[in-house]
Amino acid sequence: MTATDPAPTRPIWLADDKKRVQIIDQRMLPHNLVIVDLTTVDQVIEAIGEMMVRGAPLIGVTGAFGVFIAVQNALERGDFEAQVRKECLRIKEARPTAVNLAWGVDRVCAAVFSKTLPADCLAAALAEASAIAEEEVDNCRRIGVHGVGLIETISRQKGGKTVNVLTHCNAGWLACVEHGTATAPIYKAFEKRIDIHVWVDETRPLNQGARLTAWELGQRGVAHTVITDNAGGHLMQHGMVDMVIVGTDRSTYTGDVANKVGTYLKALAARDNNIPFYVALPSSTFDWEMTDGLAQIPIEERNPDEVRCVEGLCPDGRVEKVRIVPENSRAANYAFDVTPARLVTGFITERGVCGAGRDQVLALFPEKR
C-alpha cells in the first residue's frame, strides 16, 4: 500500500478475525502507507515506544487494545490473572508522558477482573477497549463543535477574510481515532465553508507536523503551509496568525500543559503578540492528581539519533535516513515541554471551552472536585 491509495479512516482498528489489532505505522507517512498487525504485548509496546502510534488519545486506545491482546494470549495459562497484570504494567511503562496510556490500560484491566470466567474476561476486554475508542471519537467530535465557534468569531471580526491558525506537531485524527483534537475545530470550520488556512510547524526532530499534519490536511483539502519551527514568532509579529491551537499529552487540571517540545515557545510568542493560544483535549488527557505541571509531569527523553538524523524521499522513491550532525557532537532529545497556565487562553474540551485554571476546569467537570 502506498500513500496514494485510499487511506484508512482510523489509525487503529480490530481486524476482521476479531483477534488482531491493526494500526497505521505513522513512521512511514507521508511517503508510504503501511499497515501493521499487533498480536503480542511486545508488539504493542514497540508500536507505542517507537511511535508507530503516537498522540495521547491514540496511545490510550492502543494501550486499551493491548490489554485485550494480553488477555487473549494469557487464556491458556494457569497464572492468568498474574500474567495479565504483569503485561498491563509493561504496557503502561511504554511511554511516560501521555496520561491516557495508564488511564486506558487501567480501565480495561478493571473491566477484565470484574469477571470470573476467562472467556468473559476476553469479551470484557474487547468491549471496554472498543468503548474507549468510540468515546474518544465522540469526544473529539464535540471538541470540534465547541471549538469552531472560536474560529467563526474571528472570521466575523475579519469580515470573512482568511482565518490563519497555527498548530504544532500533530493533534489530528492520526493522534486520536477520528477528527483529532487541535484539528477538530479546523475540520468543522472547513465543513462550514469558513475561509481557513493552517500554518503547520514542521516539528523537529521527527517532523510530525510536516509529515503527518500536512498529510492529513492535504487529504481533507484544507489549505495549509508547512513552516520551520522557528518561523511562528515572525508570522505573529507581522499579523499573519489569528490564533494558535495545539493538542496536549498531559495537562493538569490547574492549567499547565505538556505537549510536543516547542509548544512553550509558541505560547510565549503568542502572548507577546496578543494572539489567543488554545489547547484542545478530551477529559482523558487531564491529570486530575497533578497540580504543578513543571514540577510533576515526567518529560520523556528519546534516542538522540532522532536529532542527529533525518529521513527523506530520494528521487528514485527510496526513503533514506541521513546524518545531519557531526559524528563527535552530542545531542539531547527532550520530547515534550510544559506551558504554564498563565500563557494558555483556554481549553477546548468535549464539554465546552473554559479558562486554563482550576476553578474553570472543575466548573466543566464538577465530578472531579
From Swiss-Prot:
The keyword Isomerase applies. Keywords: Amino-acid biosynthesis, Isomerase, Methionine biosynthesis. GO terms for molecular function: S-methyl-5-thioribose-1-phosphate isomerase activity. Its EC number is 5.3.1.23. Gene3D superfamilies: translation initiation factor eif-2b, domain 1 (1.20.120.420), Translation initiation factor eif-2b, domain 2 (3.40.50.10470). Substrate binds at R54, G55, A56, R95, Q208, N259, K260. The active site is at D249 (proton donor). The keyword Endoplasmic reticulum does not apply. It is an enzyme of class 5 (isomerase). Pathway: Amino-acid biosynthesis; L-methionine biosynthesis via salvage pathway; L-methionine from S-methyl-5-thio-alpha-D-ribose 1-phosphate: step 1/6. One of its GO terms (biological process) is L-methionine salvage from methylthioadenosine. The record marks C169 as: Transition state stabilizer. It catalyses: 5-(methylsulfanyl)-alpha-D-ribose 1-phosphate = 5-(methylsulfanyl)-D-ribulose 1-phosphate. NCBIfam families: eIF-2B_rel, PRK05720.1, salvage_mtnA. Catalyzes the interconversion of methylthioribose-1-phosphate (MTR-1-P) into methylthioribulose-1-phosphate (MTRu-1-P). Belongs to the eIF-2B alpha/beta/delta subunits family. MtnA subfamily. This is Methylthioribose-1-phosphate isomerase. It comes from Desulfosudis oleivorans (strain DSM 6200 / JCM 39069 / Hxd3) (Desulfococcus oleovorans). The gene is mtnA.
